[in-house]
């Protein structure tokens, strides 16, 4: 096989908010080991999940490049991430980092280190978890009766559309009313059969604006799309 690596995001995957269980993570590690494939694990949202399963890296540490970040789990302004790599990949990772980024900002790295050691980072993680749960509660209230997928500790909602609704048209109608959502096809990676859906982000806005925006989406979904478009 020409496959040299597999990319996984097992915790609250963007966009469907799925959480991979420990057994599945272990199975992926076993298959990668059998075929000598590297694993790139994106766990930038993982710390937001309480009692989440061990990362894939825990099952295959000798071949997993583990990526995480402060940006999604503490504050957006702390733009720094970390990559933990097995010994055999360290030289290649360091070389690629020098070519693409040269170095992280030392002050930002120092702040991140201090926050980890003095407990500030975990305080912010707990705050983010609570904020996301409030926003997911709002989504559950406004989207009641609508087919969607989410987790209480997730940043997104994956909203299923009727089979005859075009994603692009639905997204355009929402945008005309001041609501930005993403078409599901933006995340499609194969030609397999596809059910129309959109991704809704619950961040980057106030809770009041979120409630209003979700209300617009619900009306678009449950109402007559042609009537709603003409009424704008």
Predicted regions and their residues:
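Structural signature of PLP-dependent enzymes
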Residues: 94-98, 116-140, 164-166
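Conserved glycine-rich beta-strand-loop-beta hairpin in the small C-terminal domain of fold type I
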Residues: 129-140, 148-160, 170
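Short hydrophobic/aromatic beta-strand micro-patches
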Residues: 84, 158-160, 201-203
């Amino acid at each position: 096989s020409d496959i040299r690596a597999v990319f996984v995001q097992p915790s609250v995957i963007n966009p469907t908010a799925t959480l991979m269980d420990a057994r599945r993570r272990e199975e992926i590690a076993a298959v990668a080991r059998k075929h000598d494939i590297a694993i790139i694990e994106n766990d930038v949202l993982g710390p937001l999940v309480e009692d989440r399963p061990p990362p894939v890296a825990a099952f295959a540490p000798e071949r997993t490049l583990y990526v995480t970040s402060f940006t999604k789990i503490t504050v957006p302004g702390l733009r720094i991430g970390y990559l933990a790599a097995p010994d055999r990949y360290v030289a290649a990772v360091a070389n690629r980092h020098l070519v693409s980024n040269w170095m992280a900002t030392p002050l930002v790295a120092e702040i991140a280190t201090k926050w980890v050691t003095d407990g500030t980072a975990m305080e912010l993680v707990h705050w983010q978890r609570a904020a996301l749960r409030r926003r997911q509660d709002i989504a559950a209230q406004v989207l009641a009766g609508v087919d969607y997928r989410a987790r209480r500790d997730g940043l997104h909602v994956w909203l299923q559309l009727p089979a005859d609704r075009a994603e692009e048209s639905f997204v355009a109608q929402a945008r005309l009313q001041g609501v930005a959502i993403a078409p599901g096809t933006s995340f499609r990676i194969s030609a397999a059969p596809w059910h129309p859906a959109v991704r809704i982000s619950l961040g980057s806005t106030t809770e009041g604006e979120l409630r209003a925006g979700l209300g617009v989406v619900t009306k678009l979904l449950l109402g007559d799309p042609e009537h709603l478009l003409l009424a704008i």
